[in-house]
Amino acid sequence: DEKSWHPFGRDISENSQVALHISASIFYQLFGFNSSLYDFVIIFPLVIGSLTAISVFAFVRVLGGTTAGLLAALMFSISAPIFTRGLIGWFKSEPLGLFFAFLAMYLFVSGIMYNKGKFSFIKLIFAGLFLSLGLSSWGGILFFLIPIIIFYLILPFLKREKNFIIWAAPVFSVSLILSLLLFERTSTFTIGYAGLVVGFSTVFVVVCELIKKFSNESKHVQNCFIFLTSIIIAMIGVFASGIVSLPGFRYLNAMNPFLTSLDPLTDSVSEHMTTSISTSYIFVSVFIIFGIIGIWFLFSRKTIDLKIDKRIFALIIGITAIYISSSFVRLEIFASVGLIILGSIGLAILFKKILESNIFSPTKILFCGVILGLFLTPVILPEDLSWTSWAEFPPTILHGGSFFQISTNDWPDAMNWLKNNTTEDAIIASWWDYGYWITTLSDRTTIVDNATVIDWQIKKMAYSLITTPE
C-alpha cells in the first residue's frame, strides 16, 4: 500500500490482518444483498459479534454444562469491554478474532477432553485452523495459546488414556502450525516464540505418555515432573541465548504490566494505559462477584461433579485472562472473557444447588431476583454511565474522540475537503490517529497511521508537531 507510511509504504501481507479482509470479502459475496461494500463493513462487526455469542455458548457448555453456556452467552452480550470493541462501524480486528478464537476453543476442548476417535481428530484439526484465522485477524488472540500450553503441561498428570493424548495433542499443534503458514504475518510465529512454546509443550505431552507407557506406574508423576523441569530449563536457555527472538514490547508488557512506563510511546496511547482498580470495576462490575463464586466452586472438591480436566482448564483460562488484562485498558476485554467463563460456571452450579435443595420456595424466588438484580444493575445504572449507554456512543469519526454523545459531520467534511482541495499526489502529515481516515476517505498518502508500523517515524512526527518551525 503506497498510500500509507510514505515513503516506505506498507506491506499488507506482512503486517495486516489478512483473515479479516478475506472473511469480509467472502461474507460480502454471500450476504451482501446488493449493498455497497462500505455499508456492509459498517454492519459486519455487529453481526460477527452477535454470532460470537453462539461460539461462547458452545465453548462454555463443554466446560460447565448447558446452563453455564447460556449464562456465558448472556454475559458476553452485555459485557461493556466486548461490545464496545464491536460496535457498528468498528471494522477492526477484535470481533472477528474473538469469533474464530472461541470457535477454536470449543473444538479444542471438546476434541481433547472426549476420546471420540475420528470425530476428535477432525475437531482438533479445525481447532488449529480456526485459531490461526483468529491470530491472523487479531494478534491479541495469542492469549488463547497461553491456557492451551499450560494445559498441555498439566495434561499428562490428568489423563489416563494411553493412546489418545499421544496423538491428540500433536494433531492440534501440527494443524495450528501448518495453518499459520497460510499467512505471511502469522507464519513468523512458527519460527518465533509462539512456535517454540507450542513445539516444546507438545513434545512434553508425547514424551510423558511414552514415559508412562514404559515405566512403573508408581514413578509416572516423578518422571514426568523431572522431564517438565528439563523442558522449562531448555526453553529458558533458548530464549536467553537469543536464538529465538522475544515477543514485541506490547506482548512482553502483557506478561509484565510494569513494563509500560519504560516505553513513553506505548504509555502515551490512551488505550495502553495501565488498568486501575476503579477502571476494572467500571468495565466488569458485578462480573467480579460471579467470577469469585466460580473460582470458589471450581477449587472445591466436594461440591461439584465437573471432571478435573474441565475445572483446571476453566481456572487456567479464567485466571490468566484476568492477569493479562492488568497491562492495558484495552485488554480489559480479556478480564471480561475470564470472568464470563468463571462466573457463568459458578452461577450455573449455584443455581443448581439452590433450586434442587429443600429450601423454602420463596427463598428460591428471592435468590433468582437477587441474581437478576445484579445482572441489571450495571446495565441500567448509573443512568448516564451504564453499560447500555456505552453502546450509544457514535464512532470516533462522528464525535472527534470526545466524551459527549454527539454526532457531527466535522471530520467527514474535513476528509472530503482534503480530497477535493489537494492534488492526488499530495502527502498529508498528521498525527497517527487520523491516518486511516485520510487514506481511505480522502484517498491521499499519509506518513503515519493507526497501524503503528514504524515507531521511529511516529516519534519524528510527534517531534515535528510539538516543536516550533525554524
Please place each PLM-identified region on the residue numbering:
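Extracytoplasmic
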Residues: 51-54, 355-470
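Alpha-helical transmembrane segments at the extracellular/periplasmic loop-to-helix junctions
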Residues: 194-209, 225-301, 308-311
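Perimembrane helix-loop-helix junctions
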Residues: 116, 144-224, 349-353
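Membrane-interface catalytic loops of GT-C/OST-like multi-pass glycosylation enzymes that act
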Residues: 89-93, 186-193, 325-336
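Membrane-embedded helix bundles of polyisoprenyl
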Residues: 43-62, 67-115, 119-157, 168-184, ...
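Membrane-interface coil-to-helix junctions
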Residues: 1-51, 79, 92-93, 99
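Hydrophobic/aromatic-rich transmembrane helices and adjacent perimembrane loops
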Residues: 315, 320-358, 362-366, 370
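Hydrophobic cores of alpha-helical transmembrane segments in multi-pass inner/ER membrane proteins
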Residues: 101-109, 145-151, 198-212, 287-296, ...
